[in-house]
Amino acid sequence: APVADVATLADVTAECEVVSITAPTATDNCGGAITGTTDATFPITAQGTTLVTWTYDDGNGNPSTQTQNVIIDDVTAPVADVATLADVTAECEVASITAPTATDNCGGAITGTTDATFPITAQGTTLVTWTYDDGNGNPSTQTQNVIIDDVTAPVADVATLADVTA
């Protein structure tokens, strides 16, 4: 049976995907150098460790195998598409806000989520926190001010006031 040229294959690591691996080799006493083959499906994108099995076949019914770890470990949080979110200002209430977005190195576009309760009606500034979650344990956050500032004085409806006589 072929003997692997390297006793232990090095782990292959990446944040998002591994699209291919250089095939290892083995040596056979009759056939010389043999390149390993695998039935692994590429790209490998699943977070965590995937075990790839390499098979060395000398063509004479004497195969041998060797395994290699492929480790996908996304450690990069999404980056907000806009560095600072614009303030949202209203006189009475803000019923909703268009969710901002971020870009993730593995997942692409991520839409922010918030646990803020809408409508926001409290006078003054309310800080809304947006969370961008890439699904791989790397959240990032961004804040946005919602400012409720009632600057319009009430106007009396004089058409409905009755005359008062004494």
What are these regions (language model features)?
Residues 1-166:
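Proline-threonine-serine-rich low-complexity tracts
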